[in-house]
Amino acid sequence: MTSPWAALAVLFTARLAMAFQYQVVASLGPLFMDRHGTNLADLGILISLYLLPGLVFALPGGGIAQRFGDRRVVASGLVVMVLGGLIMWQGQSWSLQILGRLLAGTGGVLLNVIMTKMVADWFAGRNLATAMGIFVNSWPAGIALALLLLPLIAQAGGLNAALATSMVLCIAGLALMTLAYRDPPASPGGTMPSGSWPRNSALTGILIAGCVWGLYNGALAMVFAFGPAFLVERGAALTQASGISSLVLWLAVISVPAGGLIGDRIRRPNAVLLAGLAGFAVTFALALLAPSLPVFILMGLICGLPAGPIMALPGRVLRPETRALGMGIFFTLYYFWMAVLPALSGALSEQVGSAAVAFQLGILLLALAALGTLGLTRHRAQAA
């Protein structure tokens, strides 16, 4: 396989399997609680455990890939995801569900860190924002697919059938990675030269880029985590509130790749990034003033625009020999912010007594992300 777009298709499929696996617990929560006699708090912990390993393994993941090769490490991550899925499928105790979830999330960390770097290797210098927009879209696409299919599969065959489906999708991603994927010609074997820790301007750039990505995703989390509660406070029924909030995710499947494509076409990805952040913040404000279906439709059509240009930032600040460890730094910051921000929002909402605080926090996070983007642009101009 020598086509960048064919390689991107393999990477997209593997990451889609990861998103599908992540969504299993949330989509089938009542079935997990019925089987294991747990409550919503336990379910929330099980959901969050998938991302928790990122705080530990994101940074070393880049070094591991540098030593053993990108494709081998990603394939190993998929094997760990399959093993975690197998434990959850066959495990009868809650402790085994926790173990399986942690293992699956550990494998997912390796995919997130290394495959992003692999996309940058294939598309460095051309169509990078477009490729990153498509690649990032695998996450909402996988979650949307899980929301659609898993309840139907569970209704027909029970919880085990749904868990097995997720595991089979991971196996399919593993097969594609081992049988169909090849490393880009510029990096045979998927390894990079030694001495690849980013330094000086590159280190500063990747630190800023990681914070921008984490803050942006934190703002998105405000919609999906607290949107239903906010709408219920404003008088919507729970089913209606959940449906409106999930619509943002479905529309993001369109806006995420669109942002990357537009940024590459007009050759101003940072302009698309900043406009998308500003537009997303405006929709938060509109939702606070007058929450309605059209506002959330507009939010879905705008909120994904910054994703591709943000994910293209590491490829622009890192040299090829620094990408492996640089992406580890990038995703360590992402996992940090994603661990802190939802908990912070929940605590603030509880203290104030309204989920509207989450949307106000979302505006602040987007403003900080925009300031970080402007700072990174100025930093790169000074370093040039």
Task: Give residue ranges: language-model regions.
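A late C-terminal transmembrane helix in Major Facilitator Superfamily
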Residues: 320-354
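C-terminal transmembrane helical hairpin of 12-TM major facilitator-type secondary transporters
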Residues: 269-313
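Cytoplasmic helix-loop-helix junction between adjacent transmembrane helices
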Residues: 100-138
